[in-house]
Amino acid sequence: MHAEIVMIGTELLLGELVDTNANRLAQALRDIGLDLYYKTTVGDNETRITEVLNLALYRSDVIITSGGIGPTVDDVTRQAVANATGRKLVYSLELEAQVAARFRSIGRKMAENNKRQAYIPEGALPLSNPAGTAPCFLSEDRRGRGIVISLPGVP
């Protein structure tokens, strides 16, 4: 199987943050026997992320994104994954409850903007994130081109 990593964040693209996640992801893929063919970094722009994901789905079986699934307006990975996989972005009350529970577990109240994290591509499988508040997810391409696994970015 061919794998690809897509690192998302303008701060990564411009060198303002060191990309430590890509190295860990590359090592983890190697350890489970997946061949990493490409690693791309793209800024926080829905159109460009969608373009990168479409190319990745054309040439790889497993795409792992890191970044852009937080609560701010520049966190547009969810929509870009939905676009690239041919799915609608839908609101999940279950995910909203999970995000709220995560905040309660760390003694904080969930802010209104954190509800953005309850959007997910239709049919995607939510994945737990024990380290943060952003729900991760796995989305299968509607056309059968591959899967996209979306993980949080560099803190």
Regions found by a protein language model. Give the residues of each.
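Glycine-rich phosphate/diphosphate-binding loop of Rossmann-like nucleotide-binding domains
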Residues: 1-39
